[in-house]
């Protein structure tokens, strides 16, 4: 299969970088900041959620009224030092990228993590040189699609 593969698209968090646990911990930290101590079950429930699911859970379970953008902004602020400190690769991820690149396969990241944080994480993990393109959801502009990729060099 690698002989015919021309490109490979990867998610960043949880696929190349072992960062999902830290992202999911933000859910519990957020409600604790509001003075709420989640039960073990609630903590476990939140560890399995991301995005808009957890915002709905905050409303129904804790009566916390927040929106997705506000939650994302707080989580990204808290994750910057995590990425800056270096998030480890998932086992085998860096070696697999290198094997693909050695065979001429274009390697691409598509991530919901904002571009600035993604670049911090990928640079600290020394993965940028093995990527051809990086796409992040915050790069998408409904009016203009002219700047969709972040250069990797």
Whereabouts are the PLM-identified features?
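N-terminal helical cap/lid subdomain that shapes the substrate entry/recognition surface
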Residues: 2-103, 116
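Conserved ABC ATPase "signature" region
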Residues: 77, 123-126
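Substrate-recognition element of Asp-dependent hydrolases with the DxDx(T/V) motif
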Residues: 96-122, 137
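Conserved phosphate-coupling serine/threonine residues in phosphotransfer and NTP-handling enzymes
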Residues: 15, 111-113, 149
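Conserved beta-strand segments that form the floor/walls of ligand-binding pockets within enzyme
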Residues: 9-11, 108, 135
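Conserved small/polar residues in nucleotide/adenosyl-binding loops
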Residues: 146-152
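Short loop/turn motifs at secondary-structure junctions
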Residues: 4, 127-130
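A short, structured active-site edge motif that brings together acidic residues
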Residues: 42-46, 130-143
């Amino acid at each position: 299969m690698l002989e015919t593969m021309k490109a490979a698209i990867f998610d960043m968090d949880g696929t190349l970088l072992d960062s999902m646990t830290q992202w999911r911990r933000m859910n519990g930290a957020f409600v604790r900041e509001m003075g709420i101590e989640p039960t073990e079950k609630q903590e476990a429930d939140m560890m399995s959620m991301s995005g808009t699911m957890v915002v709905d859970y905050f409303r129904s379970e804790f009566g916390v009224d927040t929106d997705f953008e506000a939650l994302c902004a707080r989580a990204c602020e808290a994750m910057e030092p995590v990425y800056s400190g270096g998030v480890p690769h998932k086992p085998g991820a860096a070696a697999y990228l290198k094997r693909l690149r050695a065979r001429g396969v274009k390697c691409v990241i598509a991530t919901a993590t904002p571009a600035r944080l993604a670049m911090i994480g990928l640079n600290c993990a020394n993965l940028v040189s093995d990527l051809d393109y990086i796409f992040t959801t915050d790069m998408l502009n409904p009016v203009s699609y002219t700047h969709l990729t972040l250069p990797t060099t």
